[in-house]
């Protein structure tokens, strides 16, 4: 999992200032990680994007009292909508890894059936890649960036 960038906060820092700094950092983390997930053979790249989105939405929630509510809700809603297709692809990645482990230890008589399941999952994952590309593009969309900038500016 990609580490989040560190944001040093001080106890006397106003909530709005801290919120802006943390949201900006989480937004930059997402922007840096997301492009690497498109077409990656490493399923952890997609997982890292999902974690970065969760960190950003969590920051929006944690600092809610220091942010303009309508702008915060709009940005959060856009993030969740744009990242939703990543969940299906990640689920398939996890299932494929699990079935591959089963296949390695399977009896010869079971291998054909397990291989078929693996092929079906791999096909579904290949189809999901188009949704991953669209989701990553949406997470880099200027409209979302503007919504996050609006939250950080309030």
Language-model features, listed with the residues they occupy:
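Function-determining surface determinants
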Residues: 1-154
């Amino acid at each position: 999992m990609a580490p989040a960038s560190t944001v040093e906060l001080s106890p006397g820092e106003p909530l709005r200032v801290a919120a802006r700094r943390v949201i900006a950092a989480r937004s930059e983390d997402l922007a840096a990680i997301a492009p690497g997930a498109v077409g990656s053979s490493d399923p952890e790249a997609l997982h890292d994007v999902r974690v970065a989105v969760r960190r950003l939405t969590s920051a929006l929630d944690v600092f809610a009292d220091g942010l303009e509510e309508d702008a915060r809700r709009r940005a959060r809603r856009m993030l969740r909508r744009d990242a939703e297709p990543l969940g299906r692809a990640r689920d398939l990645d996890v299932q494929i890894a699990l079935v591959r482990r089963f296949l390695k230890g399977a009896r010869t008589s079971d291998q054909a059936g397990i291989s078929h399941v693996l092929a079906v999952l791999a096909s579904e994952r290949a189809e999901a890649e188009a949704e991953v590309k669209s989701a990553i593009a949406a997470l880099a969309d200027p409209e979302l960036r503007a919504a996050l900038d609006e939250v950080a500016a309030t």
